[in-house]
Regions:
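Negatively charged
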Residues: 1-162
């Protein structure tokens, strides 16, 4: 198993639900209780990455202790607009972004996000960060200290104010 997620746009369509305000990337095992439905979010559709909703939180997990969720090479528009208007927080503690090359529009129009902790992002292979934070009107804190932009050739930030 590769534990790699679907492309960003496909993830966005799976998560788009009213009532989901938080997203957590984890390695915890999904609860086996009535009303909790698992969605296969793995790129190979092998169940290595699954998602479920519980109490307004969408959890994305490998269900394997110590195994991080590997973001797809194309993670563009992952949290863009369609879900962005609902999401208040995203916990990126259990992720691997080392294979990502495209982060275009990743957080664009996440209107309710106030802060983003992206310290766990490995951006060393990213070439496109264009409009990554476009329209994030509530964003007041954004820590990009660990961003390696040496390979980025597209990075336009418009309508972003800090």
């Amino acid at each position: 198993m590769k534990y790699e997620m679907v492309i960003g746009k496909d993830f966005r369509y799976n998560v788009c639900r009213k009532g989901v305000e938080h997203i957590i990337f984890t390695d915890e095992v999904a609860p086996k209780e009535k009303g909790v439905e698992l969605e296969d979010l793995s790129n190979d559709f092998d169940g290595s990455v699954v998602g479920w909703i519980k109490d307004g939180t969408y959890k994305v997990s490998t269900q394997t202790k110590g195994q991080k969720v590997i973001f797809n090479e194309d993670s563009s528009y992952m949290f863009h607009e369609r879900i962005g208007s609902y999401i208040k927080s995203i916990d990126f503690n259990n992720i691997d972004t080392s294979h990502v090359t495209n982060m275009r529009g990743m957080f664009a129009f996440c209107e309710n996000l106030e802060e983003l902790d992206l310290n766990n992002f490995d951006t060393s292979n990213v070439i496109d960060m264009n409009n990554m934070f476009d329209g994030c009107s509530s964003l007041t804190s954004l820590d990009l200290r660990n961003f390696n932009t040496s390979n980025v050739y597209k990075c336009q930030l418009k309508n972003v104010q800090f």
